[in-house]
UniProtKB/Swiss-Prot annotation:
S-adenosyl-L-methionine binds at residues 137, 166-167. GO terms for molecular function: methyltransferase activity. This is Putative S-adenosyl-L-methionine-dependent methyltransferase MUL_4763. Keywords: Methyltransferase, S-adenosyl-L-methionine, Transferase. It is an enzyme of class 2 (transferase). Belongs to the UPF0677 family. It comes from the Bacteria. GO terms for biological process: methylation. Pfam families: LCM. Exhibits S-adenosyl-L-methionine-dependent methyltransferase activity.
Amino acid sequence: MTELDEVDSLRSDGDSWTVTESVGATALGVAAARAVETAGANPLIRDEFAPILVSSAGPAWARLADPDIGWLDDDPHGQRLHRLGCDYQAVRTHFSDEYFAAAAGAGIEQAVILAAGLDCRAYRLNWPPEAVVFEIDQPKVLEYKAQILESHGVTAAATRHGVAVDLREDWPAALLRAGFDRDRPTAWLAEGLLPYLPGDAQDRLFEMITDLSAPRSRIAVESFTMNLTGNKQRWNRMRDRLGLDINVEALTYREPGRTDAAEWLANHGWQVYSVSNREEMARLGRPVPEDLVDEAITTTLLRASLEILR
């Protein structure tokens, strides 16, 4: 039996969540990292809405968004590892922000953010005047984000449609009902999503995206390895220090033999560009320190375009 087999899963068919529990709570953790980055001296990204969304979930979450990472003052190694995790979140966010900017520059005015969580791109990016952004996620997660931002007078920078549906269900039908136009090229985003889907659901997701995509559509994907050790350690510290009881390892699917995302897309008509997260972190001035290499998360960041007629 492998270490992966020994982890008891907290997931079940048809499970759901609010923003402070299960998979939903990981969106708060990611938003906290964006808040930390935004408060830095030379931020790679700016998300002024992240602190609002995180602090509204309670004082423990607000502490997690503390740019000084004061809750780890007596743990220098933990503080460095957490800072590295925030750097990674900043780099992947920057990658996807640039992706949407390039898509808009190419005349693509329809975007779909899968498992949107507390993603605020519909509010904070510079969208073309006719842009339409669809956000797909669990109903209570979308409701939390919309209510908090509305209560602070925040309005979207594009026409935004929240599509409240589980990605394991018939989300294409819900997307079409919300006004999605399958004849227009689309910029798709699957960021921080794939580990929370079973392998067969990941394949179906890509099949549905491809079926809904007009020529010239694009997609950006964050593809994970099965080794999430560094990420696990960060979440364990959050639990132990802040009382945030999140077992991220038990929330992800780690079955062997999952289809490689880049390979699947390339085999189905997409032209794929990929870069390792560590290469991208080094390029942007956030390299992984040598003594933290074994604890750092490893992912591949993908961009792909669909140029052929099917």
